[in-house]
Amino acid sequence: MNGARIAFWPKKEQHQLFNLSFSAMMLALALIASFVSHFISIPFLSALKLTIDISSVFLIACAFFVSYSWALVITVALSLCSFIWDGNNWIGILTLTIANFAIVSFTRLYFHIFAQIKLRWLWVFSLATLSNTLLLTTLNGLLITPLYWYWFGYVPTANFVEVAKIYNKTPYFHFFLFGVPNYWGGIFALYSLFNVIKFTLVSLIGVPVMRAFQKFYWKKAQIVY
């Protein structure tokens, strides 16, 4: 067993078949969601290469209805497939991969904590949203934004300390972070808002999806450890 999960089939052969088919279905849905989100243009966010990608909903479903390890496998598969339509944006794919790993891990963690209470999915997704927002906002300030600016030649180094100094004394850069003159203030203003919007949307879709899957399989499924 790989922690708490939803188990369906009593026979080993049936369980393996379900793992393969359900994981393949979730990967297909995740690919569709990720592909479509790449072409949805949102003012200002699109200029900063920020997309609202909800593919993590299906990775989370795989983590609970199959296993955490299978969810990680299809997360990697999703990232590799993303190079087909977004091959030049390796930093964005790296960020999405980290975000997907994190949201899957946080939902698993909070499910362990709130598995026995009512409205558990609401608690799980709400806390996972807050945790992922804090993690990814901080990571953007430390790594992603400096790396992105360095890759495109905006700054001479990817060291976040030096990048922050350059940003603070260069008004031209303030456009990228909502016009906030302080680097970390701008990072938290932009990426906190972006991640809250993104993962709130993931939660709004994820809660009914998880409840629907659980209800559909309820007679065959039970939470096991």
Curated annotation (Swiss-Prot):
The chain crosses the membrane at residues 25-45, 57-77, 83-103, 109-129, 135-155, 187-207. It is a multi-pass membrane protein. Keywords: Cell membrane, Membrane, Transmembrane, Transmembrane helix. One of its GO terms (cellular component) is plasma membrane. Its main location: membrane. It is found in: Cell membrane. This is Uncharacterized protein MG350.1 homolog. It comes from Mycoplasma pneumoniae (strain ATCC 29342 / M129 / Subtype 1) (Mycoplasmoides pneumoniae).
